[in-house]
């Protein structure tokens, strides 16, 4: 039997997925079903672009529902209770400086499903996060990134 993948995430990330799932089930799914019903009333389905569009959206909505259900079923909520306060771990905001003298940057390391780099949330699967995880404030770390490597100093962990 194949081993199921776990989905590490913060409690906030899990709550957002649960909210999205509820919205998909209670709002989007009924809207799409209604669109399909209306499009069917137009007659010939072979050349009915409204029907095709609604069916495509239905496939997307049902696929996303299935994806979220799986992620929630195998969710592992990150608990930093047993991790030192100055250690980089998921769910924490990390401030680091690329050496020798770049401006400090801050990111929160989150599960893959919560990742949003433009909002300062990077996936625990990203090269940056993988390189930082487990290190402590004051450590200088060499991180392998797609176009080479970079050296950073960890300034703070919150």
From Swiss-Prot:
GO MF annotations for this entry?
Answer: DNA binding; RNA polymerase binding
Q: Which organism is it from?
A: Limosilactobacillus fermentum (strain NBRC 3956 / LMG 18251)
This chain's function reads: Necessary for efficient RNA polymerase transcription elongation past template-encoded arresting sites. The arresting sites in DNA have the property of trapping a certain fraction of elongating RNA polymerases that pass through, resulting in locked ternary complexes. Cleavage of the nascent transcript by cleavage factors such as GreA or GreB allows the resumption of elongation from the new 3'terminus. GreA releases sequences of 2 to 3 nucleotides.
Give a yes or no for keyword Transcription regulation in this entry.
yes
The coiled-coil segments of this chain are: 49-69
Chain spans, region Disordered: 102-125
Family the entry assigns: Belongs to the GreA/GreB family.
- Which Pfam families is this protein grouped with? GreA_GreB, GreA_GreB_N
Q: Which SUPFAM superfamilies match?
A: FKBP-like (SSF54534), GreA transcript cleavage protein, N-terminal domain (SSF46557)
Which PANTHER family does this entry report, sorted A to Z? Answer: TRANSCRIPTION ELONGATION FACTOR GREA (PTHR30437:SF4)
Q: What is this protein called?
A: Transcription elongation factor GreA
Sorted keywords for this record are:
Coiled coil, DNA-binding, Transcription, Transcription regulation
BP GO annotations: DNA-templated transcription elongation; regulation of DNA-templated transcription elongation
List the InterPro entries hit by this protein, alphabetically: GreA/GreB_C_sf (IPR036953), TF_GreA/GreB_CS (IPR018151), Tscrpt_elong_fac_GreA (IPR006359), Tscrpt_elong_fac_GreA/B (IPR028624), Tscrpt_elong_fac_GreA/B_C (IPR001437), Tscrpt_elong_fac_GreA/B_fam (IPR023459), Tscrpt_elong_fac_GreA/B_N (IPR022691), Tscrpt_elong_fac_GreA/B_N_sf (IPR036805)
């Amino acid at each position: 039997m194949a081993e199921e993948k776990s989905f590490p995430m913060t409690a906030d990330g899990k709550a957002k997925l649960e909210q999205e799932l509820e919205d998909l089930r209670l709002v989007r799914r009924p809207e799409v079903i209604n669109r399909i019903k209306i499009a069917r009333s137009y007659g010939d389905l072979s050349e009915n672009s409204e029907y095709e569009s609604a069916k495509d959206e239905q496939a997307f909505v049902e696929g996303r529902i299935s994806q979220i259900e799986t992620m929630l079923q195998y969710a592992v909520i990150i608990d930093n209770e047993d991790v030192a306060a100055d250690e980089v771990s998921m769910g924490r905001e990390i401030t680091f400086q690329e050496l020798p003298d770049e401006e400090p940057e801050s990111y929160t390391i989150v599960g893959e499903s919560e990742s949003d780099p433009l909002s300062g949330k990077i996936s625990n699967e990203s090269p940056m996060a993988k390189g930082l995880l487990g290190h402590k404030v004051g450590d200088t770390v060499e991180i392998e990134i797609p176009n080479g490597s970079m050296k950073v100093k960890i300034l703070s962990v919150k």
